[in-house]
Amino acid sequence: MKVALLMSGGVDSSYCAHLLSSQGYEVIGIYLKLHDKNKKHDIYIANCEQVAAHLHIDFQVLDLREEFKKSVYDTFVSSYKEGKTPNPCAICNPLMKFGLGLQKALELGCDYIATGHYAQIKEVNGIKRIAKAVDESKDQSYFLYALPQEAIDRIIFPLGALLKEDIKKTALELLPFLGTLQTYKESQEICFVEQSYIDILKLHDKVDNEGVVRNSNGKAIGTHKGYMHYTIGKRKGFSVFGSHEPHYVKAINPQNNEIVVGTKEELAIDSIKALNKSLPQAFNGGIYDVKVRYRSTPLKAQIDIQGEFIYAKLLESAYGVAQGQALVLYQEDCVLGGGVITQAQ
């Protein structure tokens, strides 16, 4: 059986190459060139080539920079301009890695596509679903909620049942040269961000632009340094005159360059509206676990699907729910689907 492995040049995907080869798969390594950080590409492509040579597998580079810019990068920038908090990985996965990446794999005659994601594939009532990784501290199933079924049916996640701490140790024991691979210093999980997302936005717009902070009643109570610096739930980086209690961002008004802040109690919401990306009608009316951001604790919610929107009525309040983030539904450890949050109140 032939499998296309999306390689990043790091230890995890390199170890995947070893695992798949040792399991008898014919492996073709593919590096996706997604952004314009050429120094980063040079380092990681060289790493991939070294791994491929060591394991005697084919390797190639797929240049998707133009498609990535249109579908992921530009959406990232425009979302912040609109006062939203985008989730670029959740956009990239269905369109780039498991969209155009899978398309390339099929063109190469591959039966499957594999990645180093920490997630699993589980079969439920004859349907394959994305499921949480055994190592829940590294679980990435949240970012994979929008994958089409035709992609899920062809995915292999070699690391899904393993622990991160064991992987690195075992990988370096089996493939000692992995310890000599170059790395690229970065401080963000977002591949095209070097230091802060603000640095990206500054390339496209005036970000540092002092504005008014208002309370829930509309009264001006302070100042901020520019609305794009803030996300819902943030409690630092703005001033509130004469107040010593914590205030949190509860709304962003791009048109007037204003933010609205309130106490934690005022931040509480219990209903969410999301643009449906992948939740089947079969789950309409049920009560499921939902996550509203990557590291959030799952909450129970009653689900109502109407047209192209998902309405989630939370059974307990949530805090810091931002437009642009993903609403992801789970049943036990399996992902059912989800959408992009458009409203929370």
From Swiss-Prot:
Enzyme category, top tier: transferase
Residues binding ATP, per UniProt: 6-13, 32, 116
EC number: 2.8.1.13
Keyword ATP-binding (UniProt): yes
GO-annotated molecular function: ATP binding; tRNA binding; tRNA-uridine 2-sulfurtransferase activity
Catalytic activity annotation: S-sulfanyl-L-cysteinyl-[protein] + uridine(34) in tRNA + AH2 + ATP = 2-thiouridine(34) in tRNA + L-cysteinyl-[protein] + A + AMP + diphosphate + H(+)
Subcellular location as annotated: Cytoplasm
Keywords: ATP-binding, Cytoplasm, Disulfide bond, Nucleotide-binding, RNA-binding, Transferase, tRNA processing, tRNA-binding
One Pfam entry name: tRNA_Me_trans_M
UniProt-listed InterPro entries: MnmA-like, MnmA-like_C, MnmA-like_central, MnmA-like_central_sf, Rossmann-like_a/b/a_fold
Site (Interaction with tRNA): 117, 325
One GO term of the biological process aspect: tRNA wobble position uridine thiolation
Intrachain disulfide bonds: 92-191
Region (Interaction with tRNA) location: 138-140, 293-294
Keyword Iron: no
UniProt-annotated catalytic positions: 92, 191
Transmembrane spans: none
One GO cellular component term: cytoplasm
PANTHER family: MITOCHONDRIAL TRNA-SPECIFIC 2-THIOURIDYLASE 1 (PTHR11933:SF5), TRNA 5-METHYLAMINOMETHYL-2-THIOURIDYLATE -METHYLTRANSFERASE (PTHR11933)
Main function: Catalyzes the 2-thiolation of uridine at the wobble position (U34) of tRNA, leading to the formation of s(2)U34.
Homology family: Belongs to the MnmA/TRMU family.
Name of the protein this chain belongs to: tRNA-specific 2-thiouridylase MnmA
